[in-house]
Structures are given as structure tokens and as C-alpha cells.
Amino acid sequence: MSLSERKQICLQAMGLTLWQKKDANTADPGAVPQEPGSAGDPVEPAARPRVVVSPAIEQPVTAASADGTATLAWPELLQRIAGCTRCPLHQNRIQAVPGVGDQAAEWMFIGEAPGKDEDEQGEPFVGRAGQLLNAILHAAGLSREQVYIANTIKCRPPANRNPQHEESDQCYPFLQRQIALLQPKIIVLLGKVAAHRMLDTDQALGKLRGKIYRYQDRVPMVVTYHPAYLLRSPSQKAKVWEDLLLAKTALAEQSARQA
């Protein structure tokens, strides 16, 4: 079945085009859209992503876990995040950025930390990177209203630097509780900061892609590039489509397992 007109528009918004045979009425739904070639030659659709299941990731217990965060309901959790002073990042923030979306969503997307726009508006992924994430979601048949989006860090680091380990450790119980309350069926890790935090590794992001990991031996996780990186390296967008296909595969298997 060929992609719908809506999905083709979304792929174009990502800066991608999909090659299809002119004389064919059907197309492989697993085909990976590619960046347009400089010579205008069509690109053959890639094979479906190979599923490689990685061992479950043991999640570390931080000192902040003992303050009762692990028992909070959504309203109390969001209130505690908004008033958090656990690390120095609160001193320069306009506001904390807990997360946004459906609090019963199957899909959870985890980024790194708020930027200037997010700090001002109190919502993750609202700048140019957020616009690209919206296009990526639409290309996958999703919307911001259907997923839950959060960051590993809830306050903006100065000059948009990467979060420090101490800051991440203080914020991590909040993220753990968000996952526990949400109970997602699939988690997509956006960028190396989120991947390193959730997988407890320092491997290059390219080596972490193409595998299905397990959060607490339950929830499948897939690694992909951060939208901000894609704005600087648009040639990597097609790989994000591959990662989304892998996430869809993991979600289907998870749903079948729970049926």
C-alpha cells in the first residue's frame, strides 16, 4: 500500500522524499525515505530494519529517590518539579520544564534538556527542533497530543551546555516517576545525552542505534538522533525514519506479548 498523501507531506516536511516505482500500485511500507540525490537519481528503498534485542538496562538508584518522589501522583510530581531546588540549575531558570503530552500515551520521547525557548514557554521541544520533531511524529502517524515528551533534565543548563552528571542524578528520579506513571509501551531516546543517561553508557550514538533495549526489563527503548542535530546534519534524517520503523516493530511485539 502506498503512503497516504498526508504522510508524504509529512516526509517532505522532514526534508525527505520517498522513491516509488511509476508502474507499481504498491510500495513496501518499510521503505526508508532518503535525502534527495544531487543527480536526481531514484534511491532504492532499504530493507526493513534488523531487530537486535539488547540486554535489559539496570536503572541506578539515586540519593534523591529517598525523598518520596517514587510515590507521587501526576499533580504532585509536576508541582515538585516546578519548585525543585535540588541543583544550581534552578537559580537561572525562568521555569522548570516537566514534560508535555498524553499522560496515558503508549509512546514516550525523551530528550536532553530545555533550551531558551523551552525555558521561556515551559514546554519541551517548542523551537525549530520542536517543529522538526512534530514533522517526525506526523510522518510516523503520531502527534504531540498522542505521545508524551520529556527531558532528562527539567531546567535549562547555562548557554545550552550538556547537563552535568550531578544535575542529571538529581533530576533522574523525576524522569523515573514519569515513566512509572505513564507506563509507556515504547520509549524513543532522542540524542546522546538521553541515550547515555537511560542506557548508562558512553558509547557513540551511532553504535547505539539499531537495537532494542529494555527499561527495567519491561519497556522497549530505541535510540535515534536529536532533532537539533538533524537541523545541523539533515542527511541523517533518513536514519531517524529507520529508527522509527524499529520502534514500531518493538511496539507491535510488546503489544502482542501483553495481549
Q: Can you describe what each PLM-predicted range is?
A:
Residues S2-A259:
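A polyanion-binding, active-site-adjacent surface
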